[in-house]
Swiss-Prot record:
It comes from Shewanella frigidimarina (strain NCIMB 400). Keywords: Isomerase, tRNA processing. The gene is truB. The lineage of its organism: Bacteria, Pseudomonadati, Pseudomonadota, Gammaproteobacteria, Alteromonadales. GO terms for molecular function: RNA binding; tRNA pseudouridine(55) synthase activity. SUPFAM superfamilies: Pseudouridine synthase, PUA domain-like. One of its GO terms (biological process) is tRNA pseudouridine synthesis. The active site is at residue 47. Responsible for synthesis of pseudouridine from uracil-55 in the psi GC loop of transfer RNAs. This is tRNA pseudouridine synthase B. Signal peptide: none annotated. It catalyses: uridine(55) in tRNA = pseudouridine(55) in tRNA.
Length: 317
């Protein structure tokens, strides 16, 4: 007999405002437990030091988490000038201390280097894998392994303030950009060294900052539900964003209700107005219910590519 998953069949996205000092996986497991979800996944880890936006996908939304992983991000970062650490942040050991003689003109000149598309070598203290192991595991053992540089794009890099030896920047960048590495590289270019002391992710894709919720707020809602003797989901589920917000950047094709059966069977269907190899969101009926993604194949047909499982919301045993 097949084993049924624990938790509810609940689909949606929680915009978690992660606290500092916790891993992204710890935060993920707390959210999963608060919502009593049968399945959950995050969309790109934040360092324990970092705070801010960590979209948590529940249920069928996990099928589309890769699109958020691939999306642009925005960060507010404060760097301490004059000290370089082995991890490029304040969680590491100081390995070099130098005087800070940074003028605004020098800073503006060096910041300009990072704007646009450049090559970046990932930090050894990152989750990127080498021969199946995260780089940080090698780093903790004092082993340095080869890393290939990879292209990143910094769309915006805005100077916020320089107070004493602390520099604050606003950075809008492509996926896979290591902010710690930018700060470490900038410190070397300035001739004084630098490391991250505060990092906050303020945006993922187009998700609004004001929709974020903390673990403390979720816990408070759970306690409120217990006090009022109501089901926790009545207070918590309204916080969920629709799962198709993860793929909002793709065009939508709306099909009549009669086509639902064929789509869910994975059959390619006639659809007008699509370009070859174009990935689209598929919605059904006047209510525009999202059922998954599709792509135009070589025969000029829309082929379902990633479909959700349609289920009722009864809790699993």
């Amino acid at each position: 007999m097949a084993r049924r998953p624990k938790g509810r069949f609940i689909d949606g996205i929680v915009l978690l405002d992660k606290d500092t000092g916790m891993s992204s996986n710890f935060a993920l497991q707390r959210v999963k437990r608060f919502f009593n979800a049968n399945k959950a996944g995050h969309t790109g880890a934040l360092d324990p030091l970092a705070t801010g936006m960590l979209p948590i996908c529940l249920g069928e939304a996990t099928k589309f988490s890769q699109h958020l992983l691939d999306s642009d991000k925005r960060y507010l970062v404060t760097a301490k000038l004059g000290q370089r650490t082995d991890t490029s942040d304040s969680d590491g050991e100081v390995v070099q201390t130098r005087p800070v003689n940074v003028t605004q003109a020098l800073l503006d000149e060096k910041l300009a280097f990072f704007r646009g598309t450049t090559q970046q070598i990932p930090s050894m203290y990152s989750a990127l894998k080498y021969q199946g192991q995260p780089l940080y595991k090698y780093a903790r053992e004092g082993i340095e392994v080869p890393r290939e540089s990879r292209p990143i794009t910094v769309f915006e890099l805005n100077f916020i303030k320089l107070e004493g030896d602390e520099l604050t920047l606003d950075i809008h960048c492509s996926k896979g950009t290591y902010i710690r590495t930018i700060i470490d590289d900038l410190g070397e270019m300035l001739g004084c060294g630098a490391h991250v002391v505060m990092l906050r992710r303020t945006q993922v894709a187009e998700y609004p900052y004001e929709k974020m919720v903390t673990l403390a707020q979720l816990e408070a809602l759970l306690e409120q539900a217990h006090r009022q003797d109501v089901a926790p989901q009545t207070l918590m589920d309204p916080l969920l964003l629709p799962m198709d917000t993860a793929v909002a950047k793709f065009a939508e094709i709306n099909l009549p209700e009669a086509m639902l059966y064929y789509v869910m069977q994975g059959q390619a269907i006639q659809a007008a107005g699509l370009k070859p190899d174009e990935l689209v969101r598929i919605t059904i009926g006047d209510e525009r219910r999202f059922v998954g993604m599709g792509i135009m194949n070589d025969d000029g047909l829309l082929a379902p590519k990633r479909l959700i499982v349609i289920h009722d919301n009864d809790a699993a045993e």
